[in-house]
């Protein structure tokens, strides 16, 4: 229910932003809302509207992310890959997309740091097969999955196999995946592809680049 004393929506539960109407934040219990999307506490305040771009590349990235939300069609399976060095606000943008999709279109996403996701899956695989299967199925089928810091280190064969299964399923079933990767900007997309393929696999990287628009942030 809306907070009748909310200064943002004035008790209506909705916020008119011109070309879009959002569900007001007061309708969500903030902690439950953030946990539903698995947003880390550090990014609970992150929104597309409070991202502060400095460079032209950051402004372009913000524009693309807002357009992505506005035009989002869950049947298309389109995604975004944000590429660039640390401290550029890539995670902020991805979190902002997840929140906006849920508020504006009631489409649930789920955020995971890639290393943390693989650690949890590996732990369950070795001790609790039922939890492993349930978590993997959930990640395969969630309408929007955000994988933060993908490809930042070399992965084991097991991790590559799990990522390949996850990405291939989402690719084949046209489910949107959002990616951030902390690579320095390469001279060309071919060099970026080669660098990622060293850590992942050509099949995984090929699908990611086919299904996602790649945005360079610097």
Feature roles, as predicted:
Residues 92-105:
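P-loop NTPase Walker A phosphate-binding motif
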Residues 107-108, 141-144, 173-179:
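Loop/turn-to-beta-strand initiation segments
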